[in-house]
C-alpha cells in the first residue's frame, strides 16, 4: 500500500506539488487567523444559580433556599457535582457537568429543574441563572480613581453601575461586567419609634405608604387639535423633599401626618459585602469584565480597551480608569515566547541537516517538511476549533525534531543509492529517467518502515487523549497538535518528499566519507560496535542493570500535578477566620496592600475582600483576593525570581489571623472551579452534624501544621459566626394578637431593614431602605426595648414577645452533593506535593479519630493528579499493545516486535536521571514527555531493525544453515549499523536540537514545556545507545538462536 502511494505520487508529481502549494497557502491563512490565548479553556461545564435572600442568616438561607436547590439539582442529567454556598443574604449553587456536555443544553436542563423547585422557595425569593461564564472568565479588571477629591465612592460606584457597565456589555462575547467596591447610594428612611407610637402608626403602614407613593401611571391619550397627547401621572420619588411629603395618615381633624413627622430621610451607603482598594492608598470602585465561555479572550480585551479609551472623554473631571488586571499581556507573552521557540527550532534543525548531509539542496528537502507539516496541523486545528496557546503550540514544538526524521532517512538512503549507482556505472551519466527510478526505489525501500515508525509516534499519545477533566483539557490540545504534525509528516514523507528529492538532489552528491562529521561518527562507533557484537550477552546484562539504576532517582524526584505557571501576575488569597466586620475588612485590606506595594518588583495592587456583583463570585466578606501586577522582568532586581518574590512577599505580609497563599490568578480560578479548593492541597470533611465537622477540621488543621513541607494550614470554621437570636414566644405573642410571622416581619424591617422599592433617576436606580435608628438596634439590650405597635394598637416591646440571646453559628455553609462540608486549605512549599499528601494521609490516619457519619477526602490539585495517574495506568499498557500489533504488521515476526517493545524501558533511563538532576518532579507534564520519548525510542528501534534486516537480506548465505557463519552475520550487522550511522545520528541530533530551546527557555509557559522536554532530551542520551548497541546485540542473539533451531 505504502509502496503504491509512493510510486503513484512520483508518477503524478505535478498534481502533488500543486496540492502541496495549496496546502501551504491555506495553512498560512489559518496560522494568521487562528485565535490565540494563553491556556486552553480548562473550565468545567458549569451552571450557576444565584438566589438573593436579603438580611437572612446563612443557616436560614441554607434551610430555605440552598438545600431545596441542591437536592433538586442532583437529579439533573449529566450533573457530576453540585456545590452549595449559603452566606449572609445570598445562596449560590454550582452545578458541574460531565465533560463534553453542551453548556447551553446544561443551562436549559437546569432551568427546567429550577422551575420545579421554585414553588418551594420562600415568598418573594426568586432563583436566577448566572451568566454563561465562570470565574476563569475574569479577563480584565479596572479601578475608578478620583485623585482630585471631587467625587466620593458613591459617585464612582454610580459611574460604574450606570454608565461604564452598560457600555462594556455591548461588546460581543462579554458575558457580564461586574461592579466591585465603592459605595452604592441608598435612600434611608430612619424611623423614630417614639414618634411612630405617638401617632399610632405601625411599621407596616409606613412601608405601604412608601410603596404607594413611588409609582407612575398612564392615562391613555387624548386628542387635541388633531394631535394625540399621551397622559401620564408622575409619582416617582426623586428628592429627599419628595420623601418628606409622603402622607402616612390624616388626624381626626384632617391634619396630615407626613413621613418627616416620624422619620428622618437621608442618603447613605447600602450595606456592603464587597470592598475594593488600590495600592494601599484607599478604597476605590471598580469593574470586572467577564468573558463568555469558550470565546476569544484576546479579541474581547482589545475591544474593551478600545471602548474604555473612547469613553475617557465622557468621564467626569478628575476621574481616571486604572487597569488592574489584563490577561492579554500573558497571552501575548506566551504566544511570542512559543513562536520564538518554534523559529529557533526550525533554524537549529536546518543547520543540523546541512552539517550532516553536506548538501544544501538535500537539507532543504528535509527542512521544507517543517512548514508544510505546520500548515497541515493548523488546518486541522482550524476545523476542530482549537486556538493557538501554550499547549497547542507546545505540541508542535516537541514534534519538530521528529517531523524531519522520515525525510532525513529517505534523503540519506537516496544519497546511498545514488552513490552506489555511480560506483556501479563509473563511466555512465545519470539521466533524468534513471534518477527518478533510483530515487523512487530508494524511497520505496525505507518508506513503509518509516511510515509505521511515524504512526507509532502518533499513536503513542493515545493515553493523553483519554485524560479527563482539567488535565484532559490542558494536555488534549498538545496531544492533538503533536498528532496532527506527526501525521502530516508521515503523509509528506511518502507523498511529497520523494518528489522533492527527485527535483533537488542533483549534481554531485558528496560521498559520506567526505564529511568530517560522518568520518568522526564512524571512527567512534566502529570499535564500540565490534565489542558489542563480540559480547552481546554482556551488553544486554549491562543494559538491564542500567535500567535498575533508575530506582534511586525515582525515589527522590517526588510528584506534583503541574508545575506552577508564571503568569506574570499573582493573586494573594489569605485564609482568615470568619465574623469580620466590613470596617475591619477594609482596614485589613489596606494594610496588606500597602505592605505588598513595598516590594520593589510590584507595579500595582488591586485588593478585593468580599464579592463582586456577579454570580461567578461567591466570596464571603472575609475572603481576600488581591491581584498583584508585577513589573516587567527586566526591571526586577538582579537575581530575583518569581519564587524569591513570593518568599519576600510572604515575609513582608505578616498579620495576625492571616494564613498567606500566593497563587497565579488563572491557575487558582481553574482549581477553584474544578475542585472548589483555592490551595494546591485541600481536605474536605463532610458529615451531618456541624459541630462534629468543625471539631474534626480543627484537629486536621493542627495535625497538618506538623507535617514537613506544609507552609500554612487553615480550616474553615463552620461555627465561627456570631448570632443574636430572637426566640419568639408563641404564647406571649398570641396574647397581643400577634403571630410568629408578625414578629418576624417586625424584626426583618426594623432591625434588618426593609427594601421598599427604588428611586428612578434617569437610567439609574437606587434602593430605598426602611429601618430603625442605629442606636435602637446596636446591642441585645437595645433590641429588647424596641417598641412594637400590635394589631390591637397596643404598645409593647420586643422583649414582651421574644427572648434575645447571643450565640454562635455558621458564618457560611458549604455543601457538596447536599452534604455539609468544611474545607481545610493547605499550602506546601520546598517539598513536592505528593510526598506532603502521603505524610498528611499517614498523620491523619494515626492522630485523627473519625466521628460517626463523617468522611475525609483530599482535593485540590492532588485530586486531579490521582485521577490522571489512574487513567494513565490503564491506558499506557493498552497503547503498548497497539504499538506491538503495528510492529508485528511491519516486521511479521513476533520476536522482532517484542525486541523493540522490551527495549523501550532502557530509553527512559536517561529521562528519569535528567529529571532528578534538574530538580523536576514527576507530573502529568513529565509523564507526557515520557510517553513522547517512548514513541521516539520505538521509532529508533524500527529504523535500526530495518537497516539490519536489509543488510542481512543482502547476504543470502545467512539464510542457509550450510553456509551460515557468525563472522558473516557480524559483517552484515556491521554494514547495517556502522555504514548507516549517519541517519541515526541525524535523527538524534535534530530531536535534541529541536528540544533544547524549549528546555532552556524562559517566559510564559516554559515551566510546563521544559518538563515535557526534559524526559525527551534525557532519553535522547539512552535511546541512541539502545538503537546503536542493544538492538544489534539482541538481534545477533536472535539470529544465532534462529540458526540453531534451523540446524
UniProtKB/Swiss-Prot annotation:
Signal peptide: none annotated. It is found in: Cell inner membrane. Changing residue 738 to I: No change in copper resistance. Keywords: Cell inner membrane, Cell membrane, Copper, Copper transport, Ion transport, Membrane, Transmembrane, Transmembrane helix, Transport. Changing residue 672 to I: Loss of copper resistance. Its main location: membrane. Coiled coil: none annotated. GO terms for molecular function: copper ion binding; copper ion transmembrane transporter activity; silver ion transmembrane transporter activity; xenobiotic transmembrane transporter activity. Induction: Transcriptionally regulated by CusR in response to copper and silver ions. GO terms for biological process: copper ion export; copper ion transmembrane transport; detoxification of copper ion; intracellular copper ion homeostasis; plasma membrane copper ion transport; response to copper ion; response to silver ion; response to toxic substance. The chain crosses the membrane at residues 14-34, 338-358, 363-383, 391-411, 446-466, 485-505, 532-552, 871-891, 898-918, 928-948, 985-1005, 1012-1032. It is a multi-pass membrane protein. Changing residue 399 to D: Strong decrease in copper resistance. Pfam families: ACR_tran. GO terms for cellular component: membrane; plasma membrane. Changing residue 573 to I: Loss of copper resistance. The cus efflux system is composed of CusA, CusB, CusC and CusF. Belongs to the resistance-nodulation-cell division (RND) (TC 2.A.6) family. The cus system plays an important role in copper tolerance under anaerobic growth and, under extreme copper stress, in aerobic growth. Part of a cation efflux system that mediates resistance to copper and silver. This is Cation efflux system protein CusA. It comes from Escherichia coli (strain K12). The gene is cusA.
Amino acid at each position: 500500500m505504502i509502496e503504491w502511494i509512493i510510486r503513484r505520487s512520483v508518477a503524478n508529481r505535478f498534481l502533488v506539488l500543486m496540492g502541496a502549494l495549496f496546502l501551504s497557502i491555506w495553512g498560512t491563512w489559518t496560522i494568521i487567523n487562528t485565535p490565540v490565548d494563553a491556556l486552553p479553556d480548562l473550565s468545567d461545564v458549569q451552571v450557576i444559580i444565584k438566589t438573593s435572600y436579603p438580611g437572612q442568616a446563612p443557616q436560614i438561607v441554607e434551610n430555605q433556599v440552598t438545600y431545596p436547590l441542591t437536592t433538586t439539582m442532583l437529579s439533573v442529567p449529566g450533573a457530576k457535582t453540585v456545590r452549595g454556598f449559603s452566606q449572609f443574604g445570598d445562596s449560590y449553587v454550582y452545578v458541574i457537568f460531565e465533560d463534553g456536555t453542551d453548556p447551553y443544553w446544561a443551562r436549559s436542563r437546569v432551568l427546567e429543574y429550577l422551575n420545579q423547585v421554585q414553588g418551594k422557595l420562600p415568598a418573594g425569593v426568586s432563583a436566577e441563572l448566572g451568566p454563561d461564564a465562570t470565574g476563569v472568565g475574569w479577563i480584565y479588571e479596572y479601578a475608578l480613581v478620583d485623585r482630585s477629591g471631587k467625587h466620593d465612592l458613591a459617585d464612582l460606584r454610580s459611574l460604574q453601575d450606570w454608565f461604564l457597565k452598560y457600555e462594556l456589555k455591548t461588546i460581543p462575547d462579554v458575558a457580564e461586567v461586574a461592579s466591585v467596591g465603592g459605595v452604592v447610594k441608598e435612600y434611608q428612611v430612619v424611623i423614630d419609634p417614639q414618634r411612630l407610637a405617638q401617632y399610632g402608626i405601625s411599621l407596616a403602614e409606613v412601608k405601604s405608604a412608601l410603596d404607594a407613593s413611588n409609582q407612575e401611571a398612564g392615562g391613555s391619550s387624548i386628542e387635541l387639535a388633531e394631535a394625540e397627547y399621551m397622559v401620564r401621572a408622575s409619582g416617582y420619588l426623586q428628592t429627599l423633599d419628595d420623601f418628606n411629603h409622603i402622607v402616612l395618615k390624616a388626624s381626626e381633624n384632617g391634619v396630615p401626618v407626613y413621613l418627616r413627622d416620624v422619620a428622618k430621610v437621608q442618603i447613605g451607603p447600602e450595606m456592603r459585602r464587597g470592598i475594593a482598594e488600590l495600592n494601599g492608598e484607599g478604597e476605590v470602585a471598580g469593574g470586572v469584565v467577564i468573558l463568555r465561555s469558550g470565546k476569544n479572550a484576546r479579541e474581547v480585551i482589545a475591544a474593551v480597551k478600545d471602548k474604555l479609551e473612547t469613553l475617557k472623554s465622557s468621564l467626569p473631571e478628575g476621574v481616571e480608569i486604572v487597569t488592574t488586571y489584563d490577561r492579554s499581556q500573558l497571552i501575548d507573552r506566551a504566544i511570542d515566547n512559543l513562536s520564538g521557540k518554534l523559529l529557533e527550532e526550525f533554524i537549529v534543525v536546518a543547520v543540523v541537516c546541512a552539517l550532516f548531509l553536506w548538501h544544501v539542496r538535500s537539507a532543504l528537502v528535509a527542512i521544507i517538511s517543517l512548514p508544510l507539516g505546520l500548515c497541515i496541523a493548523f488546518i486541522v486545528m482550524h476545523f476542530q476549533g482549537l486556538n493557538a496557546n501554550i499547549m497547542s503550540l507546545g505540541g508542535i514544538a516537541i514534534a519538530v525534531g521528529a517531523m524531519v526524521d522520515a525525510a532525513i532517512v529517505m534523503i540519506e538512503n537516496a544519497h546511498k543509492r545514488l552513490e552506489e549507482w555511480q560506483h556501479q556505472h563509473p563511466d555512465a551519466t545519470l539521466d533524468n529517467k534513471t534518477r527518478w527510478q533510483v530515487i523512487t526505489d530508494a524511497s520505496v525501500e525505507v518508506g513503509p518502515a518509516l511510515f509505521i515508525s511515524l504512526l507509532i509516534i502518533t499513536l503513542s499519545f493515545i493515553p493523553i487523549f483519554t485524560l479527563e477533566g482539567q488535565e484532559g483539557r490542558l494536555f488534549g490540545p498538545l496531544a492533538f497538535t503533536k498528532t496532527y504534525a506527526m501525521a502530516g509528516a508521515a503523509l509528506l514523507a511518502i507523498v511529497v518528499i520523494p518528489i522533492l528529492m527527485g527535483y533537488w538532489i542533483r549534481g554531485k552528491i558528496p560521498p559520506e566519507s567526505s564529511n568530517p562529521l560522518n568520518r568522526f561518527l564512524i571512527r567512534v562507533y566502529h570499535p564500540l560496535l565490534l565489542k558489542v557484537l563480540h559480547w552481546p550477552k554482556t551488553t544486554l546484562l549491562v543494559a538491564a542493570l542500567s535500567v535498575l539504576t533508575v530506582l534511586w532517582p525515582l525515589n527522590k524526584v517526588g510528584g506534583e500535578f503541574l508545575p506552577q505557571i508564571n503568569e506574570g501576575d499573582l493573586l494573594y488569597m489569605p485564609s482568615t477566620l470568619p465574623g469580620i466586620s466590613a470596617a475591619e475588612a477594609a482596614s485589613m485590606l489596606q494594610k496588606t496592600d500597602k505592605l505588598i506595594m513595598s516590594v520593589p518588583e510590584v507595579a500595582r495592587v488591586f485588593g478585593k475582600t468580599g464579592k463582586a456583583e456577579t454570580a461567578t463570585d461567591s466570596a464571603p466578606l472575609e475572603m481576600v483576593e488581591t491581584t498583584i501586577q508585577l513589573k516587567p522582568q527586566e526591571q526586577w532586581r538582579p537575581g530575583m525570581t518569581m519564587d524569591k518574590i513570593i518568599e519576600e512577599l510572604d515575609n513582608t505580609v505578616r498579620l495576625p489571623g492571616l494564613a498567606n497563599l500566593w497563587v497565579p490568578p488563572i491557575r487558582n480560578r481553574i482549581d477553584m472551579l474544578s475542585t472548589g479548593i483555592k490551595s494546591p492541597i485541600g481536605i474536605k470533611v463532610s458529615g451531618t452534624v456541624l459541630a462534629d465537622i468543625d471539631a474534626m477540621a480543627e484537629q486536621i488543621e493542627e495535625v497538618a501544621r506538623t507535617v514537613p513541607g506544609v507552609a500554612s494550614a487553615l480550616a474553615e470554621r463552620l461555627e465561627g459566626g456570631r448570632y443574636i437570636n430572637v426566640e419568639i414566644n408563641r404564647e406571649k405573642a398570641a396574647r397581643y394578637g400577634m403571630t410568629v410571622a408578625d414578629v418576624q416581619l417586625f424584626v426583618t424591617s426594623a432591625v434588618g431593614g426593609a427594601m421598599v422599592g427604588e428611586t428612578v433617576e434617569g437610567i439609574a436606580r437606587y434602593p430605598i431602605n426602611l429601618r430603625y435608628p442605629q442606636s435602637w438596634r446596636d446591642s441585645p439590650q437595645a433590641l429588647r426595648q424596641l417598641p412594637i405597635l400590635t394589631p390591637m394598637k397596643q404598645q409593647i416591646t420586643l422583649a414582651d414577645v421574644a427572648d434575645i440571646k447571643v450565640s454562635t453559628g455558621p458564618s457560611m455553609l458549604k455543601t457538596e452533593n447536599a452534604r455539609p462540608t468544611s474545607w481545610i486549605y493547605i499550602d506546601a512549599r520546598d517539598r513536592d506535593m505528593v510526598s506532603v499528601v502521603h505524610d498528611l494521609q499517614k498523620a491523619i490516619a494515626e492522630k485523627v479519630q473519625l466521628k460517626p457519619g463523617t468522611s475525609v477526602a483530599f482535593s485540590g490539585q492532588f485530586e486531579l493528579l490521582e485521577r490522571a495517574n489512574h487513567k494513565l495506568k490503564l491506558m499506557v499498557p493498552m497503547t503498548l499493545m497497539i504499538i506491538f500489533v503495528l510492529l508485528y504488521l511491519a516486521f511479521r515476526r513476533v520476536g522482532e516486535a517484542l525486541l523493540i517493545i522490551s527495549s523501550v524501558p532502557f530509553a527512559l533511563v536517561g529521562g528519569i536521571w535528567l529529571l532528578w538532576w534538574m530538580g523536576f518532579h514527576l507530573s502529568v507534564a513529565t509523564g507526557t514527555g515520557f510517553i513522547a520519548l517512548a514513541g521516539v525510542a520505538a521509532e529508533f528501534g524500527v529504523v535500526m531493525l530495518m537497516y539490519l534486516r536489509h543488510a542481512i537480506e543482502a547476504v543470502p548465505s545467512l539464510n542457509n544453515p550450510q553456509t551460515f557463519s557468525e563472522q558473516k552475520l557480524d559483517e552484515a550487522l556491521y554494514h547495517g549499523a556502522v555504514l548507516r550511522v549517519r541517519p541515526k545520528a541525524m535523527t538524534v541530533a535534530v530531536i535534541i536540537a529541536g528540544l533544547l530551546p524549549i528546555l532552556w527557555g524562559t517566559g510564559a509557559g516554559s515551566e510546563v514545556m521544559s518538563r515535557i522536554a526534559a524526559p525527551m532530551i534525557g532519553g535522547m542520551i539512552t535511546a541512541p545507545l539502545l538503537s546503536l548497541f542493544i538492538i544489534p546485540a539482541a538481534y545477533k542473539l536472535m539470529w544465532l538462536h534462529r540458526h540453531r533451531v534451523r540446524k
